[in-house]
Amino acid sequence: MTTVVNLPRDPNTLSNYNNWVSTHITANFDILFDQRKLAGNVIHRFRSTTDGESNHIILDTNHLDIGSVKVNGQPSEWEYLPRLEPYGTPLKIKLDQGVKLNETIEVDISVQTTEKCTALQWLTPAQTSNKKHPYMFSQCQAIHARSIFPCQDTPDVKCTLDFNITSPLPVIASGLPVRGSSEAPKSDGKTLYKFHQKVPIPSYLFALASGDISEAPIGPRSVVATSPDKLGECQWELEADTEKFINAIEKIVYPYVWGEYNVLILPPSFPYGGMENPIFTFATPSIISKDRENIDVIAHELAHSWSGNLVTNASWEHFWLNEGWTTYLERRLRHGEPYRHFSAIIGWKALTDSVEHFGPEHDFTKLITNLKGMDPDDAFSSIPYEKGFNFLFHLENLVGKSKFDRFIPHYFNKYKGKSLDSYEFKSTILDFFKDDSDASTALNELDWDSWFYAPGLPPKPDFDTSLVDVVYDLAKKWLSLPKSSFKPQPEDIRGLTANQVVVFLEQILVSERQLTPELSKLMGEIYGLAASQNIEVANLYFQVGLQAGDASVVEPTADLLGKIGRMKFVRPLYRKLAKFDRKRALDTFEKHKGFYHPICRAMVEKDLFGKKDE
């Protein structure tokens, strides 16, 4: 039998989820640090969506070791179908007969992960902050859950979850901890940790972490969890704003449904800023900047509790429905309109960078992408975030903010617990405003096809530049050197926020005029940029220096690349370093590639060497 992609809507799954839907998963895993694998079983409850027409279930798997399969307690025949890159090896489970519409069956699969698992990263004690214990964590978005257990690995299917996880070290999962349920350590020193996720979630939100983890409160319904030696500084960074953010977004949408909102600060090799795993946001330590200036990551991941986690894109081709909405909500949380526009200006720079990286005609620069045969990770960029945000911002301006504010809770109520695509979004907003002649006319006259399918940049909004004008002016002064009489002073940036310094450095980076190596070095010395504790600032300064040809930033750049695995910083730094000193870039990558998460490592390899088949 050949392997086929079973549409309806998601081209990135091989499962036949149009015939069967998983409604509950019980995941029983033993975390084996010495073997770097998970071992156990998963029990799926499947509901039939046909009337006896399907006598087999096909699940996504990738590099898994399957032991046995039982259907309703009885051993079942199963086989692997031919592998299909990049989606893995489908698991076909045979049933004696079809099942009536809406009836359920239970499928129990014994499974172990393998060394080729793309979802898990295993850290040695040396890779953690206090160097005492090993650590593991998962990252399942976009299609990596299938490398932990057989599943319908698509955002178009959601189910409830129970986790029963045994480990010698504390465990975090994307469910509510069943408080007081952990048993006393067994003779082998392991403890059973239980979690329950009562809200149906898609497979990409399945999450596990285990290591030397302690917790501290950061709000009435929130804790931060991290390495004990970092707990105090993480608590300080997050305790002032977390509950404020929750209250603010509840006023915009509706009350938080997940019970607790907690944050796990991961070791530095985590490849993203944050991952919106329910109950426990997984976050990069790069947000701990000791100035509370980088917690917009927390605002973003919290907003995912509504957009993405409750209301979900049906496939990764419509990823903007997750990330555009989340970016829009995040920017509604903080500091009023001038700051919202300021944040959007930073986002516009990220959007132009992504369009430049792919090329203005590339399919990945469209709001709706074509991912047939593609790995969704290859399309990952700021485009769904920022093009999505700008589309929603355009709709807000089109109908008026007060009217759009009435649409927001309607939309999130209509699709609560469901997945949707862009066409359903369009029909929903058109229907909501059908009795408002002004809004309805404006929405019906909108060129939806251009927004959905045109590559490249969208129309640029008329942003309020009040918070960026001062840094635009400072950038112009630097770029006027050495011809002008401008004399840089430390006072130039005193009183600016770190995010304003970020915009200043971005202006230098995008200018057609380049700084000389001497001026770039002078900037770092006068403003103390290379020594900044804020990695958003330091990494951009290193990019400025590399672009200017300042050899003095090569060493600190290589040093930083061995300390952080967040792709937002790692990928552009490697690209800039490779242009300036390719050998040093390759040597640095060779030295640190074992430190990076598999997703990050694969993307940097593509940046440095091109695709493997090229």
UniProtKB/Swiss-Prot annotation:
* Annotated cofactor note: Binds 1 zinc ion per subunit.
Keyword presence, DNA damage: no
Q: Which UniProt keywords apply?
A: Cytoplasm, Hydrolase, Metal-binding, Metalloprotease, Nucleus, Protease, Zinc
Chain sites annotated for binding Zn(2+): H300, H304, E323
Q: Which GO terms describe its cellular component?
A: cytosol; fungal-type vacuole lumen; multivesicular body; nucleus; NVT complex
Q: Which residues form the active site?
A: E301, Y385
Task: Tell me which domain of life the UniProt entry assigns to the organism this sequence originates from.
Answer: Eukaryota
Write down the chemical reaction(s) this protein catalyses: an epoxide + H2O = an ethanediol
Q: What is its main location?
A: cytoplasm
The Swiss-Prot or TrEMBL record lists the needed cofactor(s) as: Zn(2+)
Which Pfam families does this entry report, sorted A to Z? Leuk-A4-hydro_C, Peptidase_M1, Peptidase_M1_N
GO molecular function, one example?
Answer: metallopeptidase activity
Biological-process GO terms, alphabetical: cytoplasm to vacuole targeting by the NVT pathway; lipid metabolic process; peptide catabolic process; protein catabolic process; proteolysis
- Sites where the protein binds a peptide: Q139, C140, Q141, P271, Y272, G273, G274, M275, E276
Question: What Enzyme Commission number does this protein have?
Answer: 3.4.11.-, 3.3.2.10
According to its UniProt entry, what is the function of this protein?
Answer: Aminopeptidase that preferentially cleaves di- and tripeptides. Also has low epoxide hydrolase activity (in vitro). Can hydrolyze the epoxide leukotriene LTA(4) but it forms preferentially 5,6-dihydroxy-7,9,11,14-eicosatetraenoic acid rather than the cytokine leukotriene B(4) as the product compared to the homologous mammalian enzyme (in vitro).
Protein name in the entry = Leucine aminopeptidase 2
- Specify the species: Aspergillus fumigatus (strain ATCC MYA-4609 / CBS 101355 / FGSC A1100 / Af293)
